[in-house]
Amino acid sequence: SCSLVGSEMCIRDSRCTMTRLFIMIVALALASGSGLRAQELNCEVTINTDQLQNVNRDVFTTLEESMREYFNTTHFTNDQYALNERIDCRFFLTVADYTDNVVKGDIQVQSTRPVYNSAYTTTALNFKDKNVEFSYQQGEPLIFTVNTMENQLTAILNFYAYFIIALDGDTFAPHGGDEAFERLRAIVQMAQSSGEGGWKAFEDKKNRAALLGAFTEPQTSASRDMLYQYHRTGLDEMFLSPDKGRQRITESLSALDKIYQSDPMNVALSLFKDAKLDELVNVYSKASQTEREKVAELLSKLYPTEMKRINELKAGKQK
């Protein structure tokens, strides 16, 4: 039997064991939680300053690093992402002018989405914003805020982060991007109140306000349904049943005609063209002649300047 001293040692050892066990459990929980709670974006950032002369390019090296960190460390939503679920995207800023700490240029934004049961990735977004202007001084911190507009630069970064997340969500579930689209509305409203360029409704058919409207206005909201039908019921199905998946894609394209009838110049139409036209050539390369002609007829009405690619689709070629 244990002596009094021995009993105290036993109790102490038990407490130490329990303490160590508790620490291990907490550590495992934290490690597991951090794995589940990965940030949403896996973003490559590139800044091109070839058009500039007599400028300290270190300014843009610093900005590029800050933007990369901003996109890849900010938690934009409360959703849980595994590391392999992060959205792959690219952000290209081409600087045309930098005077008095004001950057002017354009931004190309791209994002991709994996296709189920395959190694294939599909382009979800490929858009050029031609009206970009913001103030920036080297070393200026980029601060994420939800309910206020910190400055024009972070407003632009937030807009495209949420736009990428919104489109991605819609491709996986019907209106799966609802929360992100709500954030986009708030960002646009705050930016419009600031008077900064690139945000005003009706100012430009392809500015940030127009991008939001292309997916949230009643007359063009079919674009959101198309995102789900095209990707989740179409592309994701093709690698199991090519004919069935392709049929769903064909059905989804009717949304484009609805948008065209409502607004032939709507930015949703050019977004689809820039992201999907090459892909469609490959999708229909093994379709029947009747199916190819049906799709080509629709696309030629929407995109009369793209007849080279549309004729490739019609002929059953593969890119």
What are these model-predicted stretches?
Residues 1-13:
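Single conserved hydrophobic/aromatic residue that forms the stacking wall/gate
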